[in-house]
Swiss-Prot record:
Active site: C2
InterPro entries the UniProt entry points to: GATase_2_dom, Ntn_hydrolases_N
PROSITE patterns per UniProt: GATASE_TYPE_2 (PS51278)
Protein name, as recorded: Glutamine amidotransferase-like protein GlxB
Gene name for this UniProt entry: glxB
Length: 301
């Protein structure tokens, strides 16, 4: 059992409140998963710039002088430290370079996510503690997703926490269990995708990344997942401009959605949504089995 939440803002006036709203939603789901928690926040992008969220078990060592060491390695960057995580801002053209340099000069650092706009924060612990550790309430953005985990098939670690990201500005949270993830992992490794964990959710994230690399949009990739992924699952997925939800054909994992003129919201239970603005006038529904729900800022523009 896990708790997942998501919030896609249609009204830009709500964007400064994204971190506050999403934090409250996730904390409400604490009793569905007290082992670890995480959030992905899609903030504003800066043309020509990219950012990488990194994590370290020894931040006082790994993050010390990191800006200097990156510059000496030929990759100028700005580093903003937030507890065990840091956001490394670089020129977009240097994204592949910074990955290679980090692996060389900080081998114990792990990449949580990268792209133009996404920042990913996750740790072992209760949602309220993770939210406070990274000051999530102060963060603004256009959309975000969150997860609180009760571990069932892999270790309780920071790397095993959700969201999982395997592509630029792409991430996924999951409630359920996949039965064919080992076979699918082997196929994706042959396609060149690297994995950090044995978690089935990382396989689902990598599957979507691989499908979107073939030219599919998020909605099309989620439709393909209904045929290619076996097991029980509810996915909430984020891309740079999009937000998607899909449940398996049996839909045994709980889910509820709300939509107003100002936002679209997802929660494992309705209580995750009760404090959202104007929730009393929202359209509330349970997502149908084997049905893809997809919203995109670019298509709405």
């Amino acid at each position: 059992m896990c708790g997942i939440v998501g919030l896609f803002l249609k009204d830009s006036r709500l964007e400064p409140q994204l971190g506050q709203l999403l934090s409250d939603m996730l904390i409400t789901m604490t009793d569905r998963g007290p082992d670890s928690a995480g959030l992905a926040i899609y903030g504003s992008a800066t043309e020509g710039k990219a950012k990488v969220t990194i994590q370290s078990a020894k931040p006082e060592i790994d993050f010390a002088d990191l800006e200097r060491d990156l510059a000496e390695a030929g990759v100028p960057a700005r580093v903003a430290v937030k507890s065990t995580h840091a956001v490394v801002a670089i020129a977009a053209a240097r994204l592949a370079d910074v990955r290679a340099v980090l692996a060389a000069i900080r081998p114990d650092v792990r990449i949580m996510g990268a792209g133009d706009s996404v920042e990913i924060y996750k740790e072992v612990g209760l949602p309220k503690d993770v939210v406070a550790r990274f000051d999530v309430r102060s963060m603004g953005g256009s959309h975000g997703i969150g997860h609180t985990r009760m571990a069932t098939e892999s270790a309780v670690t920071t790397l095993g926490a959700h969201p999982f990201s395997t592509g630029s500005d792409q991430c996924l949270v999951h409630n359920g269990s996949l039965s064919n993830h080992n076979n699918l992992r082997r196929e994706l490794i042959r396609e060149g995708i690297a994995f950090e964990t044995q978690n089935d959710t990382e396989v689902a994230a990598a599957y979507l990344t691989a499908e979107m690399a073939k030219g599919k949009d998020l909605g099309q990739a989620l439709t393909g997942a209904l045929d290619d992924l076996d097991g029980f699952f509810t996915f909430v997925v984020g891309t740079k401009s999009g937000f998607g939800v899909v449940r398996d054909p049996i839909a045994c994992k709980p889910a509820v959605m709300a939509e107003t003129d100002r936002y679209v919201a997802f929660g494992s239970e309705y209580r995750a949504l009760v404090n959202l603005p104007d929730i009393e006038s929202a359209r509330i529904w349970e997502p149908e089995p084997a049905t893809v729900y997809f919203w995109d800022h670019q298509k709405a523009a």
